[in-house]
Amino acid sequence: MVKLANPLYTQWILEAIKKVKKQKQRPSEERICNAVSSSHGLDRKTVLEQLELSVKDGTILKVSNKGLNSYKDPDNPGRIALPKPRNHGKLDNKQSVDWNKLLKRAFEGLAESGGSTLKSIERFLKSQKDVSAACGGTAASGFHQQLRLAIKRAVGHGRLLKDGPLYRLNTKAANAEGKEGCESLSCLPPVSLLPHEKDKPVAEPIPICSFCLGTKEQNREKKPEDLISCADCGNSGHPSCLKFSPELTVRVRALRWQCIECKTCSSCRDQGKNADNMLFCDSCDRGFHMECCDPPLTRMPKGMWICQICRPRKKGRKLLQKKAAQIKRRYANPIGRPKNRLKKQSTVSKGPFSKVRTGPGRGRKRKITVSSQSASSSEEGYLERIDGLDFCRDSSAPLKFNKKTKGLIDGLTKFFTPSPDGRKARGEAVDYSELRIRKKGNRKSSTSHWPTDNQDGWESKQESEERLFGSQEIMTERDMELFRDIQEQALQKVGVTGPPDPQVRCPSVIEFGKYEIHTWYSSPYPQEYSRLPKLYLCEFCLKYMKSRTILQQHMKKCGWFHPPANEIYRKNNISVFEVDGNVSTIYCQNLCLLAKLFLDHKTLYYDVEPFLFYVLTQNDVKGCHLVGYFSKEKHCQQKYNVSCIMILPQYQRKGYGRFLIDFSYLLSKREGQAGSPEKPLSDLGRLSYMAYWKSVILECLYHQNDKQISIKKLSKLTGVCPQDITSTLHHLRMLDFRSDQFVIIRREKLIQDHMAKLQLNLRPVDVDPECLRWTPVIVSNSVVSEEEDEEADDGEKEEPQGQERELETRERVGKSVSRENKDQDSSSLIESEKKPEVKELASSSRLSKQALVRDSLPANSQPPRRGRCGRKNRKTQERFGDKDSKMLVGETLSTSQEQYGECEEKSAASRERYTEVGEQPAAPQAQADGNPDIPKGRFSESADLWRGQLKKSPETLKCRLPEGNDRLPCCYTDGDRAVFRGFSESSEEEEEPESPRSNSPPVLTKPTLKRKKPILHRRRRVRKRKHHNSSVVTETISETTEVLDEPFEDSDSERPMPRLEPTFEIEEEEEEEDENELFPRGYFHCLSSQDILRCQASSKRTASKDEEEEEEESDDADDTPVLKPVSLLRKCDVNSASLEPDTSTPMKKKKGWPKGKSRKPIHWKKRPGRKPGFKLNQDIIAVSTQECIVEPIVPIKPGRKPRTQESEELVEVKEGLVEERKEEMHTEADEEAEEEEDAASSDIRAMSPLDSSNSPDADPKEPEAEEEEEKPLDDPRQSEEEPQELEEQEQEEEDEVTAEANQNEDHDADDEDDGHLDSLKTKEPEGQPAREDGTEEPGTQESFLDASIQDSRENAKDKDETEADSEEEQPSHEASVGSETMPGSEEDHEEDSNTKEELIELKEEEEIPHSELDLETVQAVQSLTQEESSEHEGAYQDCEETLAACQTLQSYTHTDEDPQMSMVEDCHASEHNSPISSIPSHPSQSVRSVSSPSMPALESGYTQISPEQGSLSAPSMQNMETSPMMDVPSVSDHSQQVVDSGFSDLGSIESTTENYENPSSYDSTMGSSICGNNSSQSSCSYGGLSSSSSLTQNSCVVTQQMASMGNSCSMLQQNSVQPATNCNIKSPQTCVVERPPSNQQPPPPPPPPPPPQQPQPQPQQQAAPQPPPPQPQQQPPPPPQQQPQPPPPPQQQPPLSQCSMNNSFTAAPMIMEIPESGGTGNISIYERIPGDFGAGSYSQPSATFSLAKLQQLTNTIMDPHAMPYSHSPAVTSYATSVSLSNTGLAQLAPSHPLAGTPQAQATMTPPPNLAPTTMNLTSPLLQCNMSATNIGIPHTQRLQGQMPVKGHISIRSKSAPLPSATAHQQQLYGRSPPAVAMQAGPRALAVQRGMNMGVNLMPTPAYNVNSMNMNTLNAMNSYRMTQPMMNSSYHSNPAYMNQTAQYPMQMQMGMMGSQAYTQQPMQPNPHGNMMYTGPSHHSYMNAAGVPKQSLNGPYMRR
């Protein structure tokens, strides 16, 4: 007997199955058992048993799938939820069940007036016998489902109306739909044309239906039908296609119908406005905006809608219906239907109509969907229900049409879109006409219902509707009222009270705390909230809710009573909380949504992670009530301190807005930078901020009674950025232009009136800095203007010189202001302000500072120590400052701990001062700000900002307090040093470059004297580096001033960060500050002229170049007495000159690189003739140059002095800059180590150059011209003074350095790759940068360039020679000398013809230090000198023509490139300066792998890159200009340059990035094999390469190389030729090219350090020192390069030297060369490789240097592959790349030389060694230039646009065009091809400019990756550089760029060793330009002994 399942249990199981399936789960045995047991308590065993039995008897279905059993209800299987199974049961029997009849019966039987629910209908039907009989068999669920389906269908067809959960028969639908529609339409008044429609013309009708494409003969159904045509566009459609009812059609034909595309609102007649919110009348098809309706609608009405024109006038029930409709709309209309808002009448007569007339499908495609569809079931039911009568009819008709026509309408909408405008109109139009016609017809047909009279008709219509309704359910007035009341109550519970807002603000009201606030704007709350009229917000957590009930429930649970963050400020009942968008994301999002309700333009709501929100609250016992907030980006490159600010309406006009603005500036001041609100400001924001700025400035002026006050000082005191101060002063009419100066006019009445008002009406809430407890997240943003940093530096520098300078400063300030004014109003203002500030600083600061100095507080009174100790000290201090922030007390040096501690503190204070100055982004301000700013700022503003900061600085406070609390706190606020660095990047970092030196143990050991000497040395280095760095860093600095400053300072600091000798940092800082304080003028004599020049330069720049020059002369005069030795004086002079150009340019610095300006330091351009041989002078010049960056100091070229001058120039550009630059000048003169820091400082200076170059870009052009005129005057004196100063410095330094020499050599070469090698590099690159500066700004200061170049060259030559000799004598000096030589070289090239005398002088001077220098160095210097002389004589002469052409280009290339170069040089010099850096660079090479000294910069970050690699540093700095953080290309356009720069310099940038990843491996490899090789090519491989023992050799080699490279490195040497001068004008590369003489000179001496290869060409030298180990790798290629170069050096010395400089060969020396000239340019190229200098520069050195290095790199990379890019090889690569960068410069120069043919040919000589490479490079060079798109682009543009490529290549381009004014790039290429074919120069150029190296470097987006890659890449790039030139074109090509990007790692890792890769790049090469020959590249690589792939791959990647 079969056991049957218990039917009860079976039913339970089926219910369980249904329940489980309802939960979207699989009905498994387990789940069924659980469900049954939970509901019926049946045990599992029984359930399973019954389940099995049920399966057997078929009542349950068992499904097995994948081993799992599921159970289903056969009657109700899953997805087929239709009456299938049930049909089997009850409905199946009753297949004939007519659900329509059943439903009708149910509704009639229930007779519920409001409608019946589904449940009641189901209950009613189940109670009917026939139904129960029919459906009894099936489960209840089956019947329920069928019923639901039937009701749904009925609703869809319009038979039923759905109102919420209620259903009701549509009485209208009961009649024929057409009839009812007609009825509703017919009840409407007849349609008539409106007045404005009568006169309008009617378009010619198009006789084709736009929908079915039929004619009037046949429509879609092939029947004849007349068309309706649009009166505006003539498009036609069949009424049936438009879904018009006959009635509507009739009405529409009587009107002027518009299609949906042309439809305009009949009310406002604005066609373009808000088409989406347009409703189409169902009677006339006119369009109306919802807000234009009467009454306005907030939601799309459902059902039929009739416009106010057609609508009958309502009488008796008018009000009721209106309200009901409103409720209906509010409640019933779907939220999503904004368009058709139901109007009360519309509901009544329209609901049905719209369905009838096919409302949904009518012609209004867009609108109809809304309106017709809106008339769909749910809404319609609701609306109609409210209207009563309308409901039934409306629903049914519209519903019908809705479904079918919805798609149609959409389709039609698309169809009817002849014109974009007409689209909506047309659809709408169609609708209207149909409606009208329909209505007419309807009206007639249903006349019985509706009277003709509008009013009567309406009433009767309503009545009839009611009657219709009434047949089933009589709706009485009472029913309606009841319904309304209940509905309103329900709505109230949901929180909706008032009528919808016509303005469609969602929400229109919010309840927030105890306030109900009407919103001003809509906010993107989620849709379900945004449509609500009112939102309820929790005032503590800002959660938004729909109703008060929900809010009350939430408030019981919400435990918040303050924002979810730390309270950073509290005073009385006011608190500020700092909320991190990354931590409290929801809160911040809710805050943004709330803010948007009261802000017009706000786009940030959900992406809050990158922002900090400072929430202002008012506190009471209940909690902290939100008052307002402002948000700021965490890492804002533009230094915006507010991105959004909002005060809730209830707290407005109570001073809270001003409080928040003030608070934001307080935070900025604590960060040590000036801030500015995010631009553009809204109208309200502009008003608020202008009011704030006015009051702050007036109050500041009221409290500052100094006769002189600068914008910079104002900026420092207020935290307001100089641009805003300038615009405000201009607005207050307190800025005037008088006698070539911008002067701040104290309008005492205005000030007094303001203060009187203020006293009468005290501010209700004021920010009390004492109540702030906050530490900046980032000490200093890299965004801080370089100008600011420089200004800060200058401010400090100026302080010491105080009185001396006061007058000059004032004049300068005026000038500076004028120049700055050109830069920007703020800049000008700053200058003016600076005058008083300088004075004040001079007096008050000076007094207190000097006292402090005497108390061994040099930092603050940096001027006193400026001489030699000062700068160095300052650097030390600054570095220490960096450390200071990290370990201010801990790192006091053991040697002079107390002294240094004080110094450190002082430096911290001074740094803070600088920071403060930096904070005031105005360039001039920085100058004046220096000291005066600090006193004033300290006392007034410092009270607020600095107090807090002072608290932060423990030790610093001690000494800084006396100096100025402002500054100290600033420093600390900024993370003390970091901020400082960041802020006064130019100033501090310029000083910082000394830090490496300072850091070097020797300097530390000799606190005062040594400090002085090393400081001088550092100074030189600084200059070199500054020069170099300036070019590179300048660009970076503008955008990433803070970061740059930090990293570069860190570079130096971090170079010592490994902190070889924290003391040195302290020492440097101390000394610098001592310089300021202890040696107000005595020491200033060295730096004084620079500093003064800086001050003057800033002022002069601002005012005018003439004035600047005069003031510079004054400075010189001032300095001259102060200057100790002639060389020192010359240094200062040159610095002054340099500074002047810089000064003019620095103003731009703030903004970033000017478009047209070169990124090189201006002085680069200025000292084109400088020979690398004059390293000492060049060192000084480098400092000058870098300082001079703004001021193209061709004359400054004499040595690094231009760097100092550059610093000064920068200073002149900004008063603050002047001060900063002065420090720089001192620092630079003081220490090449500072030049290391100048990698950082270079950043700063570069910033200065940026400021100078950038500012000058626009601003300096006039002032620069003036400068040019005056400069020559000043320059000679400067040159003379500088060389003397340099000589003395060098001798002193050499004394010290000789002691330090070994250390320094190792350290500098290693640690400071930027040290010695870098120094050489720096010199050369910096010289180049200087030269390029000169070149860069030639346009602006062409005359100046020429005259100045000559003077500068003479001075630079003397200095360069002195420096070179000095360098040779001491490795450390050597580095610095090399660096200086580089600048000299550049300057020489540029100044060659002008400065041959100078060269001779410099040579002589060089000889003086020569005895002290190493033999190698001596040889190198000699060779450099010879080369320089020969080049000057031949190449430079040759280049003179080019120079003329170049100068034109120079004006705009100069600025851009000069600053970069300058910066790079700064970096190099600084790196060179630090003996410790040098040595420790091996261990710390990881950090500063390529340029160990630079590496600290690397450690620092980008800065590290620059400083670490003296030479690399320059390029690094160049990149740094872009991005102080070398790894942060994004920081600035130049960030690419940063990478490039770093890479170029010594692979340091790569090393830097790589160092980040694998510093040790990078360093060690670089240090040992690459270092050895790179020693000579140190310029490129300085940091990491020559980091190790080869450093000394490196130093020598570098010195030689540097000397040689001084002229653009080996390559640049060739380039160094006069064409290079042109190049100088064009770009750092150009400058580098000008260095060729130096390069060529060194080639003979270089051989001593390196093998013959190196002697031949500097490139080889570079490669040679390294080649010893990797020489086979590198040497073969370098020999080709260098061998060709030797010939070119001689050859090129005259011809190639300037432009071609043996670009191909230059590639080998490119390390040095690049660092100095290529360094900035090329490093820039590398860092800004994409379009700047990376490719070109890199290309060539890549070939030589890269070959050796590349081989090593290949070995390392192939082997140490595991290392993060095998830093060593990477370094090699980098070094090579750097070399290449220089080479690129050289090559670029050759392009130019090509223009000036001799060089090109000279370059062609190198082909023997470089032949394939050279040729390749040449072609690629050309290609690169072309591919770089730099060819036709203006240099500045190119530079800016292609940053990476632009810097160098662009510069080169400029160079190239010099000879031929054609597109620089193109010319370069064009010219280059002949010479380039053989010469690496052109190739390098090609690579550099068009080189995708830059691009690839950049494309390898991550700096680190690039860096790492870059190392390899650089190694490869070393190759690649040359190859890159070839590659450059291919790189330019997108495909190749990709390759470069994709290869970098690959190449570095495996490909490096594999030739396949090389060939691959060759293959891509075609992509770039055919010129690049893969094979050539290949051979090049082979020559190098490095895998071609290495070169090719990396390069190609680039």
Swiss-Prot record:
Biased amino acid composition, Acidic residues: 785-797, 1042-1052, 1064-1077, 1106-1119, 1229-1240, 1281-1298
EC number: 2.3.1.48
Occurrences of domain SAMD1-like winged helix (WH) (ranges): 1-77
Region (Catalytic): 486-776
Phosphoserine: modified positions: S419, S471, S785, S940, S953, S1088, S1089, S1114
Domain MYST-type HAT: start-end pairs: 502-776
Glycyl lysine isopeptide (Lys-Gly) (interchain with G-Cter in SUMO2) crosslink, residue number(s): K835
Annotated spans, Interaction with PML: 144-662, 1510-1735
N6-acetyllysine: modified positions: K172, K350, K355, K602, K815, K1006
Domain H15 positions: 95-171
Localization: Nucleus; Nucleus, Nucleolus; Nucleus, Nucleoplasm; Nucleus, PML body
Active site: E678 (proton donor/acceptor)
Descriptive protein name: Histone acetyltransferase KAT6A
Organism, scientific name: Rattus norvegicus (Rat)
